[in-house]
Structure formats: structure tokens, C-alpha cells
């Protein structure tokens, strides 16, 4: 296939770099296409890739938060299951990775255009990812500092910085080594982390009040407000992972889409539901306003350092994926750096934000606020992506997606696919109007006493808009057009 002529933007920097994807070696490939000769693995390996990050301390925190908000135990568990169903969407967009053989931040040029995609990826693939890096590193650092206090080390800003930098350094190292190392390492981490968190769960179950009811049961509209807010908090996790194509792109092109979807979704769904549920059970008797202290109160002393190390290891696993994809996102928006250097830059930014967060913000408040508000952006963007996959029947030409010239089939009008951009903006605007949180209540939400409909409005609205606007702008994806490749 002939490539289009170069423009000042030109093809991506690394578009013809040789690949190397072996565990224990630094991955040399960036966003460039993975040729069929270098494809390997099975969809089953995606289970541990997504399980390790979700055997998580934050799951306990979120589960406890639902009960603290005033939900009953049964309602909390129902919200946990419902919100985590969005992992199916994360799994679904992963099918585009093997189809195109490149990262999701490049594939999304089909939705937003060569130029428009830069702005979208800068926001969702870089800025929001950096915020999540800081959030997770903050959680692990709080746990790590608790361990240093038990060891008798005096608390100080210098010690805070050392703990953060050690955790961040381990995370960035995983991201630098890249895909094959992540796949191999996360299989072992899934087993180890599951053993530790299952042991903790058994301890929590021994203190659970199975007949728990809130002291002041919620009724009427106030009840719906808390239910929708809790649902938003839980669903924000799967809706933030638009990077799933990055981890599936090395799979053979013929890998079944259903297998990719289910192994990805199940890997994240199962531990998320189980351990978020355990967090809710813990809150029936423990004071989860201070989740670390609450959980440590049911542990034998010897288990506390094991728990803290597991929290740190899980954070490394979680943020390892985020940092890995953030490096690819930087390349896709035109930052001409090797993948390894791009990951280092992301790590420095995330570390700086973490230190600021530890010194300035209350951790639990920051978790709730971010998880309630981030879906305003991530929900519509992920839905536009999923809708494009449906409309194109998952047929993407990775080589054409790397062409950034004005003759690129993804140049659209002035480099922007206005159907995708307006659909994402429209969905985000609708979600903003209907969002309700501690820090922000949109006019629609405020008129309904804080009812949070950001997710259904943002998700359904952006999907409908993208389909309608694609026809209106004449960019409706055609499976027989030269912009696609038959599989």
C-alpha cells in the first residue's frame, strides 16, 4: 500500500521503527504499527493484565464510601455490580487494538481527525491519566507512610517525598519495560495480590454486620441522589480506561473480538466487584472515614506490613498501565520523543502532582470528587470510540491512521472530524448539566436536588450524536471505503 505524501506533520515519529516485545527487555516499539509477523499471545493473557490493577486498596475505599453515603448493604452491593458492568465497554474497545495494530490514541484519529485527536488525547490520554497517577500514588504513599511511622521514622516532608519517589520510580520502570514485561509480571502479581486481599477479606468478614441498616434510612429523592452518585463513583473506574487497545494490539489480527472483550472485562470486573463489596461490608462495623486505620484494626500486627506492601505493589501495577499508555499518548499528539523518554516525562509530572496532593488535599475527598467528575469527559469519549467500532465493524487500517498529511483519509475538514468532536463535546455538555457532586452541581442536577445523571446522559447522548452527525457531515464510516481494511 502506498503512503500519502509527507506534510509538515508527516507520518508519526517511530512509524518504521523495528519492534521488540519480549519480557525482561525494554520494549522498543512506540505507537508504530505492529506487523503481523510480530503479533503474538492469546486473549486469555488479558485477564491478568486487567486483574492485577484491580485487586486494589481503592476498591475497599470506594466500597466503604457507598455505605458512608447512607446506602444499605444490599443497595451498595447492587450499585457495585451495576457500575462495574462498564468494564464490558473497556473490553469492547480493546478489540480495535489487534484490528489496527496500534495504540488507541492513534486509532481515535478515525473519530476526531488528525488534528482534532491531538486535543482529545491531550485531555483524556495525558492530563486525566496524570491525575490518576497522582491519585493512586497518593493512596499508596499514605499506606507507605503509615508503615514508616510503625518503624519509628519521624514524619517529615522529606520522608513523604522519598516514599512517593520510590513508588513512582518502580511504576515508571514497569512502564518503560513495556508490554511483554507487563503481561508476564502481572500474571504473578495477580496471584500474589489476590492471596493477600482474600486473606484481608476473610478478616473483614469476621467483623461484618450482615443485618446492617443505615441509622437514618434514605427516602424519596434524597435516596435516588445518593444511589446515582454512588453509581457514578463506581462506574468512573471502568470509564477511565480507554487505553485497553494499547494492551491488546500485539495479539494476532485473527483473535476473536468476543474473547478480547470478555477476558479484558472479566479480569477487571471480578476483583473490582469482590473487593469493592468487601469494602462495603467493612463499613458496616468499621469507621471507613479512615480506611487504612479501619482495615488495620482487624489485622494481626504481622499482617500490616504485608498489607501495606500489597497496596504499594497494586499501585505499581495500576499506574504501570496508565504510565505506559500516557507515553504512547504523548507520541500520538506529536511529542517527538522515544516511548521510554515520554514515559519518564509523564512520571515526573505525575510525581509532582502527587507531592502537591499529599500536602494540600484530603485524600478521601479527592477520590470522591475526581471519580464523580471525571466521567463528564471520559464517558462520552469512550462511547464515541465504541460507536465508531460498531459503525466500522472494527475495520481499521493502521498504516493509514499514521498518515498525518492533508491527503490522509482521516484529515476530514481542516484535520478535524467534527462529527466526533461535537458528539464528545455534546455528550460532555449534557453530562455537565446533569452532574451532581460535592464540588459541582449542574443546573439540571441542582433542579433535582443533586440527582446525578451524568453517565446515562453523557454516554447515550454522545453515541446518538456521533451516529447522527456522521451522516450530517458525510463522514459516516463505510466498511467498503479505502479508510478500512477487510479482515
List the model feature ranges, each with a label:
Residues 2-73, 224-231, 249-257, 473-487:
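Membrane-interface "cap" regions at the ends of multi-pass membrane proteins
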Residues 43-60, 201-208, 216-282, 301-320, ...:
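Hydrophobic, membrane-embedded alpha-helices of multi-pass small-molecule transporters
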Residues 67-78, 147-161, 180-189, 291-308, ...:
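Transmembrane helix-loop boundary segments of multi-pass membrane transporters
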Residues 68, 95, 111, 119, ...:
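Membrane-water interface regions at transmembrane-helix termini and the short interhelical loops
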Residues 79-112, 121-137, 467-474:
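Juxtamembrane transmembrane-helix boundary signature
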Residues 82, 122-123, 150-177, 191-202, ...:
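Transmembrane alpha-helical segments of multi-pass small-molecule transport proteins
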Residues 117-153, 315-332:
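Hydrophobic transmembrane alpha-helices that form the core helical bundles
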Residues 381-465, 479-483:
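C-terminal membrane-solvent junction of multi-pass transporters and transport-like membrane proteins
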Amino acid at each position: 500500500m502506498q503512503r500519502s505524501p509527507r506534510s509538515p506533520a508527516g507520518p508519526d515519529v517511530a512509524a518504521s521503527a523495528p519492534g521488540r516485545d519480549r519480557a525482561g527487555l525494554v520494549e522498543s516499539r512506540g505507537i508504530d504499527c505492529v506487523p503481523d509477523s510480530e503479533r503474538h499471545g492469546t486473549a486469555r493473557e488479558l485477564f491478568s493484565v486487567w486483574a492485577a490493577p484491580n485487586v486494589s486498596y481503592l476498591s475497599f475505599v470506594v466500597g466503604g464510601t457507598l455505605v458512608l453515603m447512607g446506602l444499605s448493604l444490599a443497595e451498595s452491593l447492587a450499585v457495585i455490580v451495576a457500575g462495574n458492568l462498564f468494564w464490558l465497554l473497556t473490553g469492547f474497545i480493546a478489540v480495535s487494538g489487534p484490528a489496527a495494530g496500534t495504540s488507541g490514541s492513534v486509532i481515535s484519529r478515525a473519530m476526531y481527525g488528525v488534528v482534532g485527536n491531538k486535543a482529545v488525547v491531550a485531555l483524556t490520554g495525558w492530563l486525566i491519566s496524570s491525575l490518576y497517577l497522582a491519585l493512586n500514588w497518593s493512596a499508596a504513599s499514605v499506606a507507605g507512610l503509615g508503615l514508616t511511622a510503625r518503624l519509628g521514622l519521624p514524619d517529615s516532608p522529606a520522608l513523604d517525598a522519598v516514599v512517593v519517589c520510590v513508588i513512582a520510580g518502580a511504576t515508571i520502570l514497569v512502564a518503560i519495560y513495556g508490554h511483554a514485561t507487563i503481561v508476564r509480571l502481572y500474571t504473578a502479581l495477580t496471584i500474589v495480590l489476590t492471596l493477600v486481599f482474600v486473606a484481608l477479606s476473610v478478616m473483614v468478614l469476621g467483623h461484618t454486620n450482615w443485618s446492617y441498616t443505615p441509622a437514618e434510612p434514605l427516602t424519596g429523592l434524597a435516596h435516588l441522589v445518593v444511589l446515582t452518585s454512588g453509581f457514578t463513583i463506581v462506574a468512573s473506574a471502568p470509564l477511565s480506561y480507554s487505553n485497553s487497545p494499547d494492551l491488546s494490539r500485539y495479539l494476532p489480527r485473527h483473535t476473536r473480538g468476543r474473547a478480547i472483550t470478555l477476558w479484558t472485562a472479566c479480569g477487571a470486573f471480578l476483583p473490582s466487584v469482590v473487593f469493592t463489596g468487601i469494602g462495603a461490608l467493612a463499613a458496616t462495623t468499621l469507621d471507613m472515614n479512615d480506611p487504612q486505620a479501619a482495615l488495620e484494626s482487624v489485622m494481626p500486627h504481622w499482617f500490616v506490613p504485608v498489607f501495606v506492601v500489597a497496596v504499594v505493589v497494586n499501585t505499581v501495577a495500576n499506574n504501570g498501565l496508565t504510565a505506559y499508555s500516557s507515553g504512547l499518548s504523548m507520541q500520538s499528539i506529536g511529542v517527538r520523543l522515544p516511548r521510554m523518554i515520554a514515559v519518564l516525562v509523564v512520571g515526573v509530572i505525575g510525581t509532582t502532582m502527587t507531592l502537591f496532593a499529599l500536602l494540600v488535599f484530603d485524600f478521601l475527598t479527592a477520590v470522591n470528587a475526581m471519580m464523580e467528575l471525571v466521567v463528564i469527559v471520559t464517558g462520552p469519549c469512550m462511547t464515541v470510540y465504541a460507536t465508531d467500532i460498531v459503525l466500522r465493524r472494527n475495520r481499521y487500517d493502521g498504516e493509514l491512521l499514521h498518515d498525518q498529511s492533508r491527503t490522509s483519509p482521516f484529515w476530514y475538514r481542516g484535520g478535524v472530524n467534527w462529527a466526533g468532536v461535537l458528539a464528545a463535546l455534546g455528550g460532555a455538555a449534557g453530562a455537565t448539566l446533569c452532574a451532581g457532586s460535592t464540588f459541582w452541581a449542574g443546573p439540571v442536577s441542582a433542579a433535582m436536588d443533586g440527582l446525578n445523571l451524568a453517565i446515562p446522559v453523557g454516554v447515550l447522548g454522545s453515541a446518538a450524536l456521533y451516529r447522527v452527525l456522521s451522516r450530517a457531515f458525510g463522514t459516516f464510516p463505510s466498511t467498503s471505503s479505502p479508510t478500512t481494511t477487510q479482515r
